[in-house]
Regions:
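Glycine/threonine-rich flexible loop motifs
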Residues: 48-68
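Extended, hydrophobic alpha-helical segments in both membrane/secreted and soluble proteins
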Residues: 69-74, 84-86, 106, 120
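An anion/phosphate-binding loop that grips the pyrophosphate of nucleotide cofactors and donors
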Residues: 41
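Surface-exposed amphipathic alpha-helices with a cationic face
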Residues: 8, 74-81
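Secreted, periplasmic, or luminal enzymes acting at the cell surface/secretory milieu
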Residues: 1-4, 8-11, 89-177
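A short helix->loop->beta-strand "cap" motif at the edges of active sites that frequently abuts
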Residues: 13-14, 80-84, 103
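Functional beta-strand-loop-alpha-helix junction segments that form "active/interaction loops"
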Residues: 1-37
Length: 177
């Protein structure tokens, strides 16, 4: 369920306009379409962040800034004079300081499940209050992130211990001590 589908479900009588916006590849036509759609709207809801395949195990990055094209998109949409609500999607803390002054509201959505669109629409409609504490710290700058040298990389195959098995067995193991 996409955010667009969730909003259509929540507001079936409303005219909700969707455009591709501005993806990670530079495409001025998409940016122009997003600007034109924003000019015809009462409020702008823009989803930015990272792709779902870029977060998770063995997906470490040295630069966790929001992609410059996404920052530009939010900045350009704010120039329309409309209220801009940013949906920040990702699976890790990200740096979005440059985007913050151009957003009237930012909702951190993480990567939700199959009902993400309905859940996000419920929050945007005020039917649910997204209260609570962040489960991790969001740095203000990349320089605040610890960078380790000469540590074992993530994503290596796990080492199987002696006696390890992926099935049930009737084998007695002697203690190692």
């Amino acid at each position: 369920m996409t955010v667009y589908e969730g909003l259509k479900n929540k507001y079936p009588e409303s005219d909700i306009v969707y455009t591709d916006g501005y993806d990670l590849a530079t495409n001025e036509l998409h940016l122009m379409d997003a600007r034109n759609a924003a000019m015809q709207s009462d409020v702008v809801i823009v989803a930015v962040g990272e792709r779902f395949e870029n977060s998770g195990e063995a997906k470490s990055r040295a630069d966790i800034n929001i992609h410059p094209n996404h920052q530009l998109l939010v900045k350009e949409l704010k120039k329309t004079g409309k209220n801009v609500v940013v949906l920040l999607m990702g699976g890790r803390p990200m740096i979005f300081n440059e985007m913050t002054p151009h957003a009237d509201a930012i909702l951190l959505t993480w990567w939700l499940g199959t009902e993400a669109g309905n859940a996000i629409a419920d929050v945007l409609a005020g039917d649910y209050n997204p209260s609570g504490k962040l489960p991790m710290t969001f740095p203000a700058h990349v320089g605040q992130l610890p960078i380790y040298y000469n540590y074992k990389n993530t994503g290596r195959p796990e080492t199987k211990e002696i006696g390890y098995s992926c099935r049930y067995q009737d084998i007695d193991f002697e203690p190692a001590y």
